[in-house]
């Protein structure tokens, strides 16, 4: 099992040797260590006693240069249970003390590789039994797992919440028994009086709850002030005014339909969009701070978002139309006409993802104006000289819209998020429309950039 270690020990001639062997004979380490007397007490022992190697390089073993692995292990663990009995008269003592020096000279526990089947010294794990570490993980009130220090005491989420509710609501409890009920993980809800008293006894502080409430109130007020300062700089009233100023008069167009026109739906939509480009520039000028941007950036923003801006407008205008859209020219394009013209798929998306959603949530003009302003202030538009300024303006519109929905629709806390969810659909539909509407490159014989530049340089007409 342990191999041949005859070069470590020498024993009397004739003992255990093969026939004809007259020199010193090796002895198994297990037999040697099972005896009780020193090796040199035997009369025939003539060689030097066993000693640990002094240098690692002098040892001719493959096991980490520690000499016999049997010595290293048995010095700490004792002889193995399967040790062979030594013949009478041969007694050996335990390994000399010098062997301990060999073990202690090992640089780390990784240098000691145990024999197969024996655990490594460095892999022994001992659980921590420090009282302090246990207290931090146990609720001082009920003994459940602690989630941290709450109101001065390590406690679980249940006891933390119970104490906070008691203080904030100023609750008063009574005990049905003798005010000495057991409060533990299983029975903590049985008696609220005793549970609250134990919270106090263990050190929970009433003032800590009150201070937490005060901090929350101050933080909410601070956030409200920040939001207020944001939307005061981008008043929703001015955004609504911009929408109303360019709103086409379509009251008398309700009875008109596609049959009144000889053109196909795509041509009619193009003509309507052509007309709306003029009013779109007027609308943008009325949006707060848009005119403060450089003229080049104004052109870039309108060119990047015109399709989405127009689609949002006629989609909201069409919420009162049955299964179709109402153009700014007053024409009503029905779903069947769009399918006949080969644009049914994109037309259906406009109806289901925009018109229907706007109708379901009853989106008002102020919300529409804010969504369009968010589209207008696109900091990702290519070529902007100052994208960060545009992004700041967009964030102000976000703040204005959020404040408006909270004030106007307090019973709908998710309304702001619902409004923003229309923007990805608007972007996707806008990109798809460009495949069908080719008019955007030219306004008659005028390139769109030149047209927009001329429109933006024209003074705003206040009506």
UniProtKB/Swiss-Prot annotation:
Keyword terms: Cytoplasm, DNA-binding, Metal-binding, Nucleus, Receptor, Transcription, Transcription regulation, Zinc, Zinc-finger
Cellular component per GO, a single term: cytoplasm
Ubl conjugation keyword on record: no
Domain called NR LBD: residue spans: 231-459
Stretch list, region Modulating: 1-138
Main localization, broad class: nucleus
Gene Ontology terms, MF aspect: molecular condensate scaffold activity; nuclear steroid receptor activity; sequence-specific double-stranded DNA binding; zinc ion binding
Quaternary structure and interacting proteins, as annotated: Homodimer. Heterodimer with a RAR molecule. Binds DNA preferentially as a RAR/RXR heterodimer. Interacts with RARA.
Protein name as it appears in the record: Retinoic acid receptor RXR-gamma
Species assigned in the record: Pongo abelii
Chain's gene name: RXRG
């Amino acid at each position: 099992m342990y191999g041949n270690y005859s070069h470590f020990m020498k024993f009397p001639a004739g003992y255990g040797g093969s026939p004809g062997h007259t020199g010193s004979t090796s002895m198994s380490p297990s037999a040697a260590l099972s005896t009780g007397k020193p090796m040199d007490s035997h009369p025939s022992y003539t060689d030097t006693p066993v000693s640990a190697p002094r240098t690692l390089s002098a040892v001719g073993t493959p096991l980490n240069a520690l000499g016999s692995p049997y010595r290293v292990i048995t010095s700490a663990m004792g002889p193995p249970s399967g040790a062979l009995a030594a013949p009478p008269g041969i007694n050996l003592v335990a390994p000399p003390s010098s062997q301990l020096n060999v073990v202690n000279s090992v640089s780390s526990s990784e240098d000691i590789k145990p024999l197969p089947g024996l655990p490594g010294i460095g892999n022994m794990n001992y659980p921590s039994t420090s009282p302090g570490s246990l207290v931090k993980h146990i609720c001082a009130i009920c003994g459940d797992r602690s989630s941290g220090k709450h109101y001065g005491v390590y406690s679980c989420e249940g006891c933390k919440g119970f104490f906070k509710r008691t203080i904030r609501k100023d609750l008063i409890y009574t005990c049905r028994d003798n005010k000495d009920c057991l409060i533990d993980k299983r029975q903590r809800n049985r008696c609220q009086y005793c549970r609250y008293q134990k919270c106090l006894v263990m050190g929970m502080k009433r003032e800590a709850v009150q201070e937490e409430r005060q901090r929350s109130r101050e933080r909410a007020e601070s956030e409200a002030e920040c939001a207020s300062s944001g939307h005061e700089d981008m008043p929703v009233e001015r955004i609504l005014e911009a929408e109303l100023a360019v709103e086409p008069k379509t009251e008398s167009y309700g009875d008109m339909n596609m049959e009144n026109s000889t053109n196909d739906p795509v041509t009619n939509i193009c003509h309507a969009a052509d007309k709306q480009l003029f009013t779109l520039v007027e609308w943008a000028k009325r949006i707060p701070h848009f005119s403060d941007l450089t003229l080049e950036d104004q052109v870039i923003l309108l060119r990047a978002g015109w399709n989405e801006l127009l689609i949002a407008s006629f989609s909201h205008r069409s919420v009162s139309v049955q299964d179709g859209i109402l153009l700014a020219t007053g024409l009503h394009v029905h779903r069947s006409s769009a399918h006949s013209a080969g644009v049914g798929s994109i037309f259906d998306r406009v109806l289901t993802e925009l018109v229907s959603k706007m109708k379901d949530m009853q989106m008002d003009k102020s919300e529409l104006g804010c969504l369009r302003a968010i589209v207008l202030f696109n900091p990702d538009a290519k070529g902007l000289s100052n994208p960060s300024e545009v992004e700041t303006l967009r964030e102000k519109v976000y703040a204005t819209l959020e404040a408006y929905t909270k004030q106007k629709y307090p019973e709908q806390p998710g309304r702001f998020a619902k409004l923003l969810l229309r923007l990805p659909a608007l972007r996707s539909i806008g990109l798809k429309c460009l495949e069908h509407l080719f008019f955007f490159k030219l306004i008659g014989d005028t390139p769109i950039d030149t047209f927009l530049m001329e429109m933006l340089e024209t003074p705003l007409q206040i009506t």
